Amino acid sequence: MRDSKDALDDKSGSFTSLLPPFGKQRGTSPNDAIPIKSPLERLANSVTSPEKPTVRTAIQKDSPRRKQIDDDQTPPKHLKRSFQNVTVVSPRKKKTIDVVELPFTKGGYGGFYDPRPGCLKFTTHEINVSYTDTSIPVIHIPVQLLKRCCWLQGWRDNLVESPVHAIHLTLKNRDMKRITIGDSASLLFLYNPLHVESARAGLDLLDQSDFSLTSPSSAKEFKQLLTLKQSTIIPRTPQKTVRSIVKQTSSPHSSKMPKHSLPSSPTPFNSNSGDSLLSRIKNSNQSSSERPTANNGAQEQNQSSSSAGNTSNDFSTLCSQGSDKTLLSDASCTTILVYPFSGTNSIAITNTDLTRLNEGEFLNDTIVDFYLRYLYCKLQTQNPSLANDTHIFNTFFYNRLTSKDKDGKRLGHRGVRKWTQKVDLFHKKYIIVPINETFHWYLAIICNIDRLMPVDTKLEEQDEIVMSSVEQPSASKTRQAELTSNSPAILIFDSLANLHKGALNYLREYLLEEAFERKNVHLKSTDIRGFHAKVPQQSNFSDCGIYALHFVELFLETPEQVIANTLDKSLRRTDAKNFDQQWNLQKINTMRCDLKGLIRRLSTEWSSNNERQSLSSGSNDEEDKENDDDLAILPITN
C-alpha cells in the first residue's frame, strides 16, 4: 500500500480519487488526505505510529466515565471512524420527468419530406430534433419560436381515411430561418401510433404559454397539415417554378408513385374502404381533367420529371396539390343540423363534425356542446325542477378561464366575469364543467355550493359577510369530517384516472371570486373540497369524450345517487360488486352509433322545419304583394 503523498505525486491520481466511496474526509488540502484502506483495516479506530502508542478515546460500556488522556500522549490529528459506523444517507427525492423522447419515422422541413428517422426530445423550454444519422446536426427549436403546434391522430370520413399520427410545428416567420433549411415555416414529424402516450407526455411537458396547441377540425385541415408548403410567392408561370424546384432538390413529390393512391401511415389501415374511395377519386379526376389549371400543370410536371428515388413514400399523393382537389372535391363542409331549431345560442353541426363519431376518432367541441345542450333540453321537459337547479357550461368556459393575456398572466375570473351575468350560480345545486386538456376530455361537477350561502336574511344586509360568522364547521373539523352527498365539493370524473389538482384549484379560485363579486361573501378554500371519483376506465385513447358525455347523462338521471356512491365510503364498498351495472357500461359501447342516429333524426326534423318555414314565408310574401296592389299613390298638392 502506498502512502498518500506518493499517490498524490502520481500524475494519474487526484485528490478526489483518494476519497473513500462513502463520503469526503475532513480537510481541504491534499496534505490532509488519508490513504485509502481496505474494509478490514477500516475496522481499526485510528492509524498507529511506532513512536507513540495509540490512545483509545471511545467510551467503554462498563466504565461510568471517560478515561483521562496523559499530557505527553496526544491523539493523532485525524481519527478514522470505523467502517461499521459509517452510514450513507441518500434521501429519496421525487423524480420529475425532465425529458420525453418520441421516435419519429419520417420528418419534414424546408418544404419537403425527409424519409430519415430520428427522435424528438421534449423539454420544458425547447424541442430537439436528432436523426439516427449522426452526421446530421441536431435541430434546437425553442418554445419562444413556436407559433402553433398541431397534434394529428388520424382521420377517417367518407372520402379520406388515414391513420397518420404526426406533430406539425409552425414557426414564427421572423425566426424560421434560424431553425430550418429553406423557406418553409412548417415542420412535420410522423410517428408510430404505438407511441401516442409519449407524444401526449411530450406535448404536456412543453411550456404552452408562447404558442397554441390545437388539433385539426376537418379533413381539409388534416390534409393541409400533412402537406408541407413553401412560403415563397409563386410567379405566374407555375410550371417553370415547379421544374426548377424539382431539379434543385430531391423531393419525394418527384418519386415514382401510383397516380392515384390513398393517404397512408407507417402502420397499415383497413383496405376495404379504399375501393369505394378509389373509384370516387377516378371519377372526379375524369371530370376535372377537362379543366386545365395551374395545379394540374404542376401535378403533370411532377409526374413527368419523376426520377429514381424513394419509391416507398406513402405520402406523395397526400402532399401533391392535385390530390388536394380530388380527395376533397365532394367533402364540402355543409350544415346538416342547427340545434335547437330556434332561439339563441344554437349549435350548428356540419358533415365533418359527424365524422368525429366514427370509431377511433376524438370528439370535437361541437359534438360535446351539442349533446350537453340536448341533455339539458330533455331535462327541462322531463324534470323541470332539476333543470332549474342545474347549470351546464360550454366547452369554451374552462379554456377561457385558464387562458393568459398578452402579459402572460392567467385571466381567471376576469376572463369569464360576464358569463354569469344572468345566472346565479349559488342558487344552483349542480354545475357541470366539461374540460379538454391536451386533447383529453374529462368532467368536473360542482355540487351543493348553495349550502355555502348564509341562510339568515339579516346577514345579507351587511356590507361584508364572512363565512366564519355563519354556523359552519371549523377548518380543522372540515378536514377531518368525511364527505357526504350534501357536502360542497368539486368532483372530477376522468376515464383515464389522472389527477387534476390544477383544475380543482382553478375552479375553486373561480368560485371564491364569484362569491365575493356577486354575493359579497368571503369564502375559504377549505369550504370547497375536491374529490376524484372512481369511474370506469376507457380501453383506448379516443373514447374520452364518449365517457365524459356518458357520465353527464348518467348524473342527470340520478344526481343524488351518483354523488352518494362517489363520496360515501359505505356505499362505495357495497356497490363495488355492481360497479359495471351502476355505470351502465353496455351503453358506452353503442354510444357513437346512438349519437349518429340522434343527429340524423334531428337533421331530418330540422330540414322539414326549414321547408315549412320557407313555405309559410313565401305565402306571406304573396299576400303582401296582393295587398300592395290595392294601394294607390296620391299626388302631392300644395
Swiss-Prot record:
It is found in: Nucleus. GO terms for cellular component: cytoplasm; cytoplasmic stress granule; nucleus. Residues 1-12 have a biased composition (Basic and acidic residues). Residues 238-249, 267-314, 610-619 have a biased composition (Polar residues). It comes from the Eukaryota. The active site is at residues 440, 494, 544. Pfam families: Peptidase_C48. Keywords: Hydrolase, Nucleus, Phosphoprotein, Protease, Thiol protease, Ubl conjugation pathway. The modification Phosphothreonine is found at residue 526. GO terms for biological process: protein desumoylation; proteolysis; regulation of cytoplasmic translation. Residues 1-79, 238-314, 610-638 are annotated as: Disordered. Residues 250-264 have a biased composition (Low complexity). Gene3D superfamilies: 1.10.418.20, Ubiquitin-related. InterPro entries: Papain-like_cys_pep_sf, Peptidase_C48_C, Sentrin-specific_protease. Residues 620-631 have a biased composition (Acidic residues). One of its GO terms (molecular function) is deSUMOylase activity. PROSITE patterns: ULP_PROTEASE (PS50600). Belongs to the peptidase C48 family. This is Ubiquitin-like-specific protease 2. It comes from Schizosaccharomyces pombe (strain 972 / ATCC 24843). The lineage of its organism: Eukaryota, Fungi, Dikarya, Ascomycota, Taphrinomycotina.
